[in-house]
C-alpha cells in the first residue's frame, strides 16, 4: 500500500505533526532525518543515488552498499495487524513515506518485531566431518523415536545431494533451520482455525507490491521478460496443502538482502511458502516427449491431499554419479535435529500421520534454500542465491536430470526408473553427511545464448539451454489487454473446459494477446485441445467477458522473446496478391467511373448548346428575326400585358418592347391556371408554325449574341421595384423567421396569415404572392424553405391559401449545409400546431425528382384535404441543372397534376429567390405561349415578377438557363404540331 503524498489537513493536523516531530527530535539524537528510510519498495525516490533498497521482508529499507548482513524478522499475523493499523493512522493524517514522522514511527515499529539469531558455525574437526559422537539431539532421538519410525521418516526427509548439482538440497539440518522449524511445525501440528475477521489483513494494502519474484512457477520463464510482456502468477489451485492454508495468519520469512528499488519486491508471508514449494517443484524439467507418472496413493488408502507435485514427471537418476556407501552405524543428523525439535513439542515421530510426514518432508526441502548464508557474508551469498535461482528458473538442460522428489515408503513402482531412484536414495541416506564449509563465492561464466547474447551462468552448474516450448494464445480486440481481463477470460475458459483454474500457468499478455501454458490435468487436455475448445465457445466467452476474440492457436517462445503465433488458418501468399489486385482494380474502376461521369456531364452541356444553335429552320435566321421584331413594333400601342403603362425603352435594353398579337380580353379571370401537359410530349399550344419559327429564330439570335445578353442582364440588375419597403419583415419579432436577410417580402406584396390561428400570434411569413395577370388570384406563392420554428406557419399558409401543389427545388442538405428543414413526417403522421400531416405515399419518379402525397387535416375543424409535393433534387444552390430536359419533364408532371385548379402553386427553394424565380419565370412564359399570347419578352416578364418579390433569378447563368429552357420547349411544341 502506498501512502498518499497529499499534504496534511489545515489547522490542528499540521500543528500536531510539528509538535510530534519536535518531541521525537528531543527524544532521539540526530533528529528525524537520522532514521534510515523505510518504504523504498513503495516509493523509489526515498533512496539516494548512493543507496540501494534492501528487501527487509516488509517495506524495504535504504542502505549504503550491500555488504552488511541483515537480521531475519519473525513476522506474525499480530505484527501485520499492528502495522496495518499504524499505516491507516498515518494515512489518515495525510502523511507520506517522505515525512520524517512516518519514517520514525515505522522505524519504531520495525524495532519491535522479533529477530531470529543468525546461524552459528558448527564445531568441526580437521577432517571437515561432523563428529561421529551424537550430541543431545542424538540422545533425544534415541529416547523418543522408536526403531520402526526412523526408516519411515528417512524416506520422507531430504537426502544429501547425489550429483552435487544443488548444494544444500540435502544438507543436514543447521541451527538456523532448527530456529525456523518451530513456527513451521506450529502450522503442521496445530489444527487449522478459521481466521478471526479482526486479524485478517486487507490484501489491498499490500497487493500492488506483492507479486512473484521470478515470474512463473514452472521455471520456463526467466527473470527478464520481453518488452511489452507482463506476467502474472498462475491461477490459484483448487486445493492447497494443510500447512499452506494457515500461512496467511502466521508466516516466517527472512529479510534476505535484495536488490535495488528497481527490482520487484518480495512476496508476502502467506505467499512465501506456497511460492517456495512450487519453485522447488518447478525445478523438475517438464519434457513434453516423456510420459507423466502421477504419484500413487500411500498404503492404507490415505492420499496426499494438496500435494503440489502431483501430476509432475518422475524422472530417474540415470547418469548420476553414485557415491560409495558410508558405514551404516553413522546416525542421520537430520533425523536427530527433527526429533529434537519435535520432542520440544511433546510429539514423537511415530505419532505423525502420513500427511504430516509428507508436509514435513516438503518443509525440509524448502529450508536449506534459505539457509545457505554464512554469518559474515549473508548479503552477498543471498544475492548469489537469488541469481542462481533465477538462472535455474530460466531453463534446465534436458541432458542433466534434476534431483528427484523423495518418494513415499512402500509406494508400488512399476518401472525400473523408480526402482533405481529408490536404490540411490537409500545409498545417499547411508552416506555420512559432510560438514558444511564456508560457501565459496560463485564465479560467473559468460555463455553464448542461441540469440547471440552473452549470459552469465554459475560455475559448477550445468549449462542451461532454453528449449522451444509451446504456448497457447488468445488474441482479443482490446489493445493492450489488461491483466485482470486476461485472468477473467481464463477463469471462464476453465469453467467451459471443466478444468481447474490452477491448470493454467505462465499467464502473460502481449499487447492484445493472452498467452498461457497448461499443467498436466485430469482430463489430459493439451494446449491444442484448450485453444480449440476456446474457439468453439468463442461466443460464450465474448458474451461473459465483453471482449471480442479474434484468433486462438498455439505458438512458440524462446528466451523471453516475443511469442511468434502460428495462426490456425494462414493466408496463402497467392490469396494476398489476389486481394491486393482486386483492391487496386476497384480503385482504378472508381477513378474511371468518375472520369466518365465528368466527361458525360461536360458532353451534355456541349450538346445542349449545339442543340440550341440548331433550333431554327434553315434560311430563316436574318429574315425571320427581322419580321418578328417588325410585328412586335406594330403592336406597341396595344394594352400592356401587365396592365401598366409602358415607358420608353432604355437605350441599353435590347428588344425590351412587350407586345401581344391576341386581344387582351381573351384572358378570363379563371384562365391563369396551367394547362396540363405530358412528360413525353409538350402540350398542344395555340401557336402556328410561322409564329413558332420566328420565336425560335429570335431566341437563337438572342442567345448567340453574348454581348446583348450581358447588357440585358446588367439592365435587369439595375432595375429597382417601386415600392420596395420591407419594414414588416425586418421587425424585431419577425427577423428570426427569415432564413436569409437579403431576400425578404415587400410590405405591399406578402402573404398575411390569420393572427387568431397562428401559434406565434403574428401574421408574418416570408412568402410573396406572384400575380400573372389577375390581381385577385395569384398564380404562385414564392417562399423560402421552412425553418424548424416556422413549419406550423408554413402549413397554416398552405391551408389558408387552399394550395394543393407544392414545388420544392432544393435538397434538404447540400455540401453539409442545411438548405431546408424537413416539414413533413418520414412516415405516418405528425402534428404541426393544429394541422396534422399524414404521409400517404412517396414515389421516386426518376433520379431527378420524386413525388409525395399527403393528407392535410385541421384538427379544429376536422376538415381534410389532399396535397401533392413535387421535389426536384438535381438543382445545385448557386448553379443550374446539367440539362434542361429533366426540369422540363418535371414541369410537365407538375402541370398535369395541376390541371383545372384555381389555387396558387407554392414554389420554394432555400432562400425563395434564385431557383424559385427561375422556375416561375420559365413556367409563366411557357404558359403564356400555350394560351396563344404571341410575345416572348423574357426580360420584361422577369421585371414583372421582381416587382412582387426581390431577388428572383439571382445569377446570369440562371437567366440564360431560363432562355434555353423556353427555346427547348418551343422547339418541342413545333415538332408536335401537324406539318
Curated annotation (Swiss-Prot):
Q: Which GO terms describe its biological process?
A: dense core granule maturation; insulin secretion involved in cellular response to glucose stimulus; luteinization; positive regulation of transcription by RNA polymerase II; positive regulation of type B pancreatic cell proliferation; regulation of secretion; response to reactive oxygen species
Subunit structure of this entry?
Answer: Homodimer; shown for the unprocessed protein (proICA512) in the endoplasmic reticulum and resolved during protein maturation as ICA512-TMF seems to be predominantly monomeric in secretory granules; however, ICA512-CCF interacts with ICA512-TMF disrupting the ICA512-TMF:SNTB2 complex. The isolated lumenal RESP18 homology domain has been shown to form disulfide-linked homooligomers. Interacts (via cytoplasmic domain) with phosphorylated SNTB2; this protects PTPRN against cleavage by CAPN1 to produce ICA512-CCF.
Identify this protein by name.
Answer: Receptor-type tyrosine-protein phosphatase-like N
PANTHER family given in the database record:
IA-2 PROTEIN TYROSINE PHOSPHATASE, ISOFORM C, RECEPTOR-TYPE TYROSINE-PROTEIN PHOSPHATASE-LIKE N
Q: Which residues lie on this side of the membrane: Cytoplasmic?
A: 601-979
Segment RESP18 homology domain: which positions? 35-131
Q: Where is the composition biased (Low complexity)?
A: 652-677
Q: How is it modified after translation?
A: N-glycosylated.
Q: Which gene encodes it?
A: PTPRN
In this chain, composition skew of type Pro residues spans: 400-409
Q: Which Pfam families match?
A: Receptor_IA-2 (PF11548), RESP18 (PF14948), Y_phosphatase (PF00102)
Q: In which tissues is it expressed?
A: Detected in pituitary (at protein level).
Modification type Phosphoserine: residues = 308-309
Matching Gene3D superfamilies: Protein tyrosine phosphatase superfamily, Protein-tyrosine phosphatase receptor IA-2 ectodomain
Record-stated family: Belongs to the protein-tyrosine phosphatase family. Receptor class 8 subfamily.
Query: Which parts pass through the membrane?
Result: 576-600
Q: Show which residues form the site (Cleavage).
A: 448-449
| Cross-link entry Glycyl lysine isopeptide (Lys-Gly) (interchain with G-Cter in SUMO), positions | 754
Keyword check for Transcription, yes or no: yes
Q: Which UniProt keywords apply?
A: Cell membrane, Cell projection, Cytoplasmic vesicle, Disulfide bond, Endosome, Glycoprotein, Isopeptide bond, Membrane, Nucleus, Phosphoprotein, Receptor, Signal, Synapse, Transcription, Transcription regulation, Transmembrane, Transmembrane helix, Ubl conjugation
Domain Tyrosine-protein phosphatase, by residue range, is 709-969
The record's section on SUPFAM superfamilies has:
(Phosphotyrosine protein) phosphatases II
Instruction: Provide the membrane topology annotation.
Output: Single-pass type I membrane protein
List the residue ranges of the region (Sufficient for dimerization of proICA512).
Answer: 449-575, 601-732
- Where is the major localization of this protein? membrane
Q: Where in the cell is it found?
A: Membrane; Cytoplasmic vesicle, Secretory vesicle membrane; Perikaryon; Cell projection, Axon
**Where is the sequence biased in composition, kind Polar residues?**
451-466
Amino acid at each position: 500500500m502506498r501512502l498518499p503524498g497529499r499534504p496534511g489537513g489545515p489547522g490542528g493536523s499540521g500543528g500536531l505533526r510539528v509538535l510530534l516531530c519536535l518531541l521525537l527530535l528531543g527524544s532521539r539524537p540526530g533528529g528525524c532525518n537520522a532514521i534510515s528510510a523505510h518504504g523504498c519498495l513503495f516509493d523509489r525516490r526515498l533512496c539516494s543515488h548512493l543507496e540501494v533498497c534492501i528487501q527487509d521482508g516488509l517495506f524495504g529499507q535504504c542502505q549504503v552498499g550491500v555488504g552488511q548482513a541483515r537480521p531475519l524478522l519473525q513476522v506474525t499475523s499480530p505484527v501485520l495487524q499492528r502495522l496495518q493499523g499504524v499505516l491507516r493512522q498515518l494515512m489518515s493524517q495525510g502523511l507520506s513515506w517522505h515525512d520524517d514522522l512516518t519514517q520514525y514511527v515505522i522505524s519504531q515499529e520495525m524495532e519491535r518485531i522479533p529477530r531470529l539469531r543468525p546461524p552459528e558455525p558448527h564445531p568441526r574437526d580437521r577432517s571437515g566431518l561432523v563428529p561421529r559422537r551424537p550430541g543431545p539431539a542424538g540422545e533425544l532421538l534415541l529416547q523418543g523415536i522408536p526403531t520402526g519410525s526412523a526408516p519411515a521418516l528417512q524416506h520422507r526427509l531430504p537426502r544429501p545431494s547425489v550429483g552435487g548439482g544443488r548444494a544444500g538440497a540435502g544438507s543436514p539440518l543447521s541451527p538456523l533451520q532448527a530456529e525456523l522449524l518451530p513456527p513451521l511445525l506450529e502450522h503442521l501440528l496445530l489444527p487449522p482455525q478459521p481466521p478471526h475477521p479482526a486479524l485478517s489483513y486487507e490484501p489491498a494494502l499490500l497487493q500492488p507490491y506483492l507479486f512473484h519474484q521470478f515470474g512463473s512457477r514452472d521455471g520456463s520463464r526467466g527473470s527478464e521478460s520481453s518488452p511489452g510482456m507482463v506476467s502474472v502468477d498462475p491461477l490459484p489451485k483448487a486445493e492447497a496443502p494443510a500447512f499452506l492454508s494457515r500461512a496467511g495468519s502466521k508466516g516466517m520469512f527472512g529479510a534476505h538482502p535484495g536488490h535495488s528499488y528497481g527490482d520487484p519486491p518480495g512476496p508476502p508471508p502467506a505467499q512465501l511458502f506456497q511460492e517456495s514449494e512450487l519453485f522447488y517443484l518447478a525445478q523438475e524439467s517438464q519434457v513434453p516427449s516423456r510420459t507423466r507418472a502421477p504419484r500413487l496413493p500411500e498404503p492404507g488408502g490415505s492420499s496426499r491431499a494438496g500435494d503440489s507435485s502431483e501430476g509432475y514427471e518422475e524422472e530417474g537418476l540415470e547418469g548420476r554419479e553414485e557415491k560409495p556407501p558410508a558405514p551404516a552405524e553413522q546416525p542421520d543428523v537430520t533425523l536427530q535435529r527433527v526429533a529434537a525439535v519435535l520432542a520440544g513439542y511433546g510429539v514423537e515421530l511415530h505419532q505423525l500421520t502420513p500427511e504430516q510426514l509428507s508436509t514435513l518432508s516438503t518443509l525440509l526441502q524448502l529450508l536449506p534454500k534459505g539457509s545457505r548464508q554464512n554469518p559474515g557474508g549473508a548479503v552477498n551469498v543471498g544475492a548469489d542465491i537469488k541469481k542462481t535461482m533465477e538462472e535455474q528458473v530460466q531453463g534446465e538442460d534436458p541432458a542433466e536430470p534434476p534431483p528427484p522428489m523423495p518418494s513415499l515408503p512402500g509406494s508400488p513402482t512399476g518401472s525400473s526408473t523408480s526402482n533405481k531412484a529408490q536404490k540411490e536414495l537409500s545409498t545417499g541416506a547411508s552416506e555420512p553427511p559432510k560438514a558444511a564449509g564456508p560457501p565459496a563465492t560463485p564465479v560467473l561464466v559468460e555463455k553464448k545464448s542461441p540469440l547471440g547474447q552473452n549470459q552469465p551462468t554459475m560455475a559448477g552448474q550445468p549449462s542451461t539451454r532454453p528449449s522451444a516450448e509451446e504456448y497457447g494464445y488468445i488474441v482479443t480486440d482490446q489493445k493492450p489487454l489488461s491483466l485482470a481481463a486476461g485472468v477473467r477470460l481464463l477463469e471462464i475458459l476453465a469453467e467451459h473446459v471443466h478444468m481447474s483454474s490452477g491448470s493454467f500457468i505462465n499467464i502473460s499478455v502481449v499487447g492484445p494477446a493472452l498467452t498461457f501454458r497448461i499443467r498436466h490435468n485430469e482430463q489430459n487436455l493439451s494446449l491444442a485441445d484448450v485453444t480449440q475448445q476456446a474457439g468453439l465457445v468463442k461466443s460464450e466467452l465474448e458474451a461473459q467477458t465483453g471482449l471480442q476474440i479474434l484468433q486462438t492457436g498455439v505458438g512458440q517462445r524462446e528466451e523471453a522473446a516475443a511469442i511468434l503465433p502460428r495462426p490456425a488458418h494462414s493466408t496463402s501468399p497467392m490469396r494476398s496478391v489476389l486481394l491486393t489486385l482486386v483492391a487496386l482494380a476497384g480503385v482504378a474502376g472508381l477513378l474511371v467511373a468518375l472520369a466518365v461521369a465528368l466527361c458525360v456531364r461536360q458532353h451534355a452541356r456541349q450538346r445542349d448548346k449545339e442543340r440550341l444553335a440548331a433550333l431554327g429552320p434553315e434560311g430563316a435566321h436574318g429574315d425571320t428575326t427581322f419580321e418578328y421584331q417588325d410585328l412586335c413594333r406594330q403592336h406597341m400601342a396595344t394594352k400592356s400585358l401587365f396592365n401598366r403603362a409602358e415607358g420608353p425603352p432604355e437605350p441599353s435594353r435590347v428588344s425590351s418592347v412587350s407586345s401581344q398579337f391576341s386581344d387582351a380580353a381573351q384572358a378570363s379571370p379563371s384562365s391563369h391556371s396551367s394547362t396540363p401537359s405530358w412528360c413525353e410530349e409538350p402540350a398542344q399550344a395555340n401557336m402556328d408554325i410561322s409564329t413558332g419559327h420566328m420565336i425560335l429564330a429570335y431566341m437563337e439570335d438572342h442567345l448567340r449574341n453574348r454581348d446583348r445578353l450581358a447588357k440585358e442582364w446588367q439592365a435587369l440588375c439595375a432595375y429597382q421595384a417601386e415600392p420596395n419597403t420591407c419594414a414588416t419583415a425586418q421587425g424585431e419579432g419577425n427577423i428570426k423567421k427569415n432564413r436569409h436577410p437579403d431576400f425578404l417580402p415587400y410590405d405591399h406584396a406578402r402573404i398575411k396569415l390569420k393572427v387568431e390561428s397562428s401559434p406565434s400570434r403574428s401574421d408574418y411569413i416570408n412568402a410573396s404572392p406572384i400575380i400573372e395577370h389577375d390581381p385577385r388570384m395569384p398564380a404562385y406563392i414564392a417562399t423560402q424553405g421552412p425553418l424548424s420554428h416556422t413549419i406550423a406557419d408554413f402549413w397554416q399558409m398552405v391551408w389558408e391559401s387552399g394550395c394543393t401543389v407544392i414545388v420544392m427545388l432544393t435538397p434538404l442538405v447540400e455540401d453539409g449545409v442545411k438548405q431546408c428543414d424537413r416539414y413533413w413526417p418520414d412516415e405516418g403522421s405528425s402534428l404541426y400546431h393544429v394541422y396534422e400531416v399524414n404521409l400517404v405515399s412517396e414515389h421516386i419518379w426518376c433520379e431527378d425528382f420524386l413525388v409525395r402525397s399527403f393528407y392535410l387535416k385541421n384538427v379544429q375543424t376536422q376538415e381534410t384535404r389532399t396535397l401533392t409535393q413535387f421535389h426536384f433534387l438535381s438543382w445545385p444552390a448557386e448553379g443550374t441543372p446539367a440539362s434542361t430536359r429533366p426540369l422540363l419533364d418535371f414541369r410537365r408532371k407538375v402541370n398535369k397534376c395541376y390541371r383545372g385548379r384555381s389555387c396558387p402553386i407554392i414554389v420554394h427553394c432555400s432562400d425563395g429567390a434564385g431557383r424559385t424565380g427561375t422556375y416561375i419565370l420559365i413556367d409563366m412564359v411557357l404558359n403564356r405561349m400555350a394560351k396563344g399570347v404571341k410575345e416572348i419578352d423574357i426580360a420584361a416578364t422577369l421585371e414583372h415578377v421582381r416587382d412582387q418579390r426581390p431577388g428572383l433569378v439571382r445569377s446570369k447563368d440562371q437567366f440564360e438557363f431560363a432562355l434555353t429552357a423556353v427555346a427547348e420547349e418551343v422547339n418541342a411544341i413545333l415538332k408536335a404540331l401537324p406539318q
